Amino acid sequence: MAATGKPIVVVGGGMTGLAAAYYLRKFAGDAGIPARVTIVEASNRLGGKIETLRKDGFVIEKGPDSFLARKKAILELAADLGIDDELVPINPSGKKSYIVFRGKLHPMPDGLMLGIPTEIAPMLRTGLLSPLGKLRAGLDFVLPARKGGGDESIGAFLTRRLGREVVERIAEPLLAGIYAGDLDRLSLMATFPQFREAELRHGSLILGMRRAMRRRPAAGADGSPAARAGAEAEARSAASGNGAERSGAEPHAPSPADAILARFRGAPFLNFRRGLATIVEALERELAGADWRLGRRAVALRKGGAGDSGARYAVVLEDGEELAADAVIVTAPAWEAEKLLGDHVDCGMLRNVRYASVANVVLAFDKASFGREFHGSGFLVPRAEGRQITACTWTSSKWLHTSPPDKVLLRCYVGRAGDEDAVSLPDDQLVRLVRRDLEELIGVTAAPEMTEITRLHRSMPQYPVGHVEAMRDFRRRLAEALPGVWAAGAAFDGIGLPDCVRQARETAEAAIREWRDIAP
């Protein structure tokens, strides 16, 4: 790109920011618009929460561990980058998952979709619910739908439809785990709007989700937030009938993503053979001609370009440097976005997006001394169990590429909204607490050969009730106050990697459209 091209600044070097910068350069080139892209990242590394450790034959994800296969935005990006041949599916024999109840692992009942039962017999047989709890869940078939619109919490909605027992023992560990959140505070319409749609369309949440289950192959869910987030998106697409696979949708030519899905037919989640850092590294290579400001924090946005540049805006860095910009894409967390934009537009809704802190504790064992075989991919721990770990993925069982054949790799999750103290414990104490839970829950007494702890402070956005309307209003006022400035990322419209890529692409497209509209 020409150094004298139209200047654009992307604030944030995580998945959304890198993908936005990539698509800006791509779309600008396709449109014949010279563009000069600068990426500003406060830390000294790229990728945001994505970080892969490759060590001694292990491939260890320190952040997210996979992404939903059916959300095509990230597959299209992988194909564009030429890394789709590096994709790997989960182990087909490692899909079974469990829920802890009263200190014991219980198989997740068949027919669950996001914690919502779609088959009667498995729910009648499960030991997770009492007879009264099962009867209460059955009232969903006769209870009328709530009248009126408006948002409500996930917890309030599910309690109304299925009863508190189902919520606390089945739905909460699965759904709340996606956001490391509190179901009684998280927005229904920002997280699982398909639940409300099922209620309105079918008069029953169970019947609505049963139809969704029959339309799509079950995604399954294990202990990982990525798997839970993937299951959420899978069900959302199925229940709402969105996408080209919807009955009655017009046919379209197969895309690169369609070819990838055909290759991994039935695999709900994907990763890369050398870890998720593969896509970050590929984006960095493609952006070699961009300008970088690593370890430099953007602290202000000023109308009027830097110096005599004639640009619309100046992005001010903490060391005083000013970057001229005709367009700015802010992909930073909500509190950082508020600092940049708050002088120009009301950012109260960004202050309402609070963040939970979590930790990942990875333990590697020698298989010969481990003492047991795993048949499945992991387990979930309800909040009511009072454990330190919220979930555990049997990583070497779920992802065959992650460890040598003579080793066992486990990944445990600690921390959720309102229960985050353990995240900040010293390493030895945190490992001790995790090992205690593993011993009591699954009988693991062997000492790990290696541990790897990652603390992700303020990493999980908590969408409050009313989030969708608040963000729609915020974006409208942002466009009015600061034309050519956009905000995207996990704080706004979906926390999964595919959602971040989708937002990045949509924002880049909007920027190119605006440039065309205002071109003389």
What annotation goes with each model-predicted range?
Residues 2-16:
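Beta1/beta-strand and adjacent pyrophosphate-binding region of the FAD-binding site
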Residues 16, 45, 335:
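Conserved Rossmann-like nucleotide-cofactor binding loop
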Residues 25-55:
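Glycine-rich FAD pyrophosphate-binding loop
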Residues 56-145:
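Dinucleotide-binding Rossmann-like beta1-alpha1 core, especially the glycine-rich loop
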Residues 73-110, 161-168, 286-294, 299-313:
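Feature captures the FAD/FMN-dependent oxidoreductase FAD-binding
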Residues 109-111, 117, 373-376, 391-520:
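Conserved flavin/dinucleotide-binding core of flavoenzymes
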Residues 116, 120, 134-300:
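Active-site/ligand-binding neighborhood in enzyme catalytic cores
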Residues 225-227, 241, 294-410, 417-424, ...:
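Mid-domain catalytic core of redox enzymes
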